[in-house]
Amino acid sequence: MRPLARIRYGIAASLAAMLVAGAALAVPIVTKEGVLPFGTELGEDAAALPTELFATELAGGKRSYQQKLGDMLFSSPAIFGGVAKQAGMSCNTCHQQGAGNAALFVPRLSSRHGNFDTTGALFNPKTDNGLFDPVIVPSLRGAKNLAPYGHDGRFASLRDFIRNVVVNEFAGPEPSGEVLDALVAYVQDISFLPNPKMTSDGKLAAAASDAAHRGEAVFNRPFRHDASMSCATCHQPSNAFADGQVHDIGSGGRFKTKTLVNADFNAPYFHDGRFDSYDQVVGYFDKRYDLGLSAGERADLVAYLDAVGDASTPATTDTVQTELDEIAVFVTVLDTAIHDHNAAIVAVAVDTVGGEWRELGEHYPEAKNTSVTAGLKQRGAARVAVREMVLTLRQVDMAAARGDFHAAAEAYADYREQVAPATSALAAAEPFSLFDPSVRRQHFAALARLAELAK
């Protein structure tokens, strides 16, 4: 879930550059503490979320406690430090549902939407290299089989890569072995999305177009000036369309080969996001390697890349139930931590789950929000229910912190009893919430009008 409750919308920022475009809205924000630059966009306002599937469940199994702990930590600001923690950011802020984030923009750190400088001074001054070198936020789908890690492939293991992100990029404290193991287990379980146009061994299926099949031949054809090379040399179809190597393709250094699987949803492209489309990418390689492609061959190659990069259900509509389902996963971690008398994990779980509830409550506009006039009683009841859930969670944390796990278990039992009535209250108010497309449009249209008045 995206932590809207912890990343507060400053009036000046949210009104000065509000854009309304169907379901996709660009909402510049500042935090309550003002720690993020004016005009920051975290892409947390979309009505649909990237679909997230797990290899364990696709194989018919069930996710382990460790994987669920990693999932929860992935959405927790507690593992970061400095500005990121103050702003309520988490791994999930940038890697939404394990995917990328093409809407991300941080002034002075981003050259375009979808990239930012991970070695700039904002999040960790100690690792500031004095260069402006933004990189895209990569999708983590299929990461288990996509070593090495980092855009330049400097990390051989996913564990080292994750530690670097937490400690060096976002100034977090040194994570414990338990935390690192859990994050690795979670990321390794994030699966590629199914693609009916492709077979399991990287070949086109019958569902692919004729143009894509012609493009497949172009993709595998040797370059005219170097018969030892083809597109498939680096983007190996049988190896998730990658080769585990770094190469200098004239883009400013040596960078790892990106997978093409599900890449339709990974734009912008190249390490710095300089290209928006496959057509631009193909044009670059055609010129760089003097491939001599005809207009038809270029179009066919684009069709092939589009087929390889496709997915059957790339996004999932955000609803009350999808949010509650995620909270339920995180709560299982809290359950186990109480049983194990693990006060540290209880504290993180309460903070994270409480944040998820508060974010959920933000979808139900307050009475003073005059852009939403209907369902005032229902919205009020939903917000009260959310507050009660958060308060009960605090009782769990306070009891665990003083070592009274019997009291923590009792408070947790109270929490579980409150879930059903809270769910009913949220469901009753859903037609009057920002989960409803018409209410959402009305709400943000009102903010856009205020932005015009503020000019």
Regions found by a protein language model. Name each.
Residues 2-8:
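Positively charged n-region of N-terminal signal peptides that target proteins for export
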